[in-house]
């Protein structure tokens, strides 16, 4: 399995419990398709470089994980369909 990391930005109007649910939801997608979720680093609410969908702030999080192509495909599909995601980026983790 290859190592990856995903950075995503959630809308700032989510409650703390909702944010935790989102983190767990993406973790379960990784596990469901044979991946191994790693550590998550929640950066919290930060100002965006530019306005996205009328939001000037977002809740940033970085999750490391390992997986094959199907994990990437399904995680990306979940991120695209989730309306509380403003932006995301999945990259291969060269340091792992």
Swiss-Prot record:
Keywords recorded for this protein, A-Z: Ribonucleoprotein, Ribosomal protein, RNA-binding, rRNA-binding
Instruction: Kindly name one Pfam family recorded for this protein.
Output: Ribosomal_S6
- Keyword field contains Iron-sulfur: no
| Top-level taxon | Bacteria
Molecular function (Gene Ontology), one example: small ribosomal subunit rRNA binding
Q: Which GO terms describe its cellular component?
A: cytoplasm; ribonucleoprotein complex; ribosome
User: Alphabetically, which GO biological process terms does the record hold?
Assistant: translation
Where would you find the membrane-spanning parts of this chain? none
The record's annotation in InterPro entries points to: Ribosomal_bS6, Ribosomal_bS6_sf, Ribosomal_S6_plastid/chlpt, Transl_elong_EF1B/ribsomal_bS6
PANTHER family in the record = MITOCHONDRIAL 28S RIBOSOMAL PROTEIN S6, SMALL RIBOSOMAL SUBUNIT PROTEIN BS6M
- UniProt function note: Binds together with bS18 to 16S ribosomal RNA.
Q: Which family does it belong to?
A: Belongs to the bacterial ribosomal protein bS6 family.
Can you name this protein?
Small ribosomal subunit protein bS6
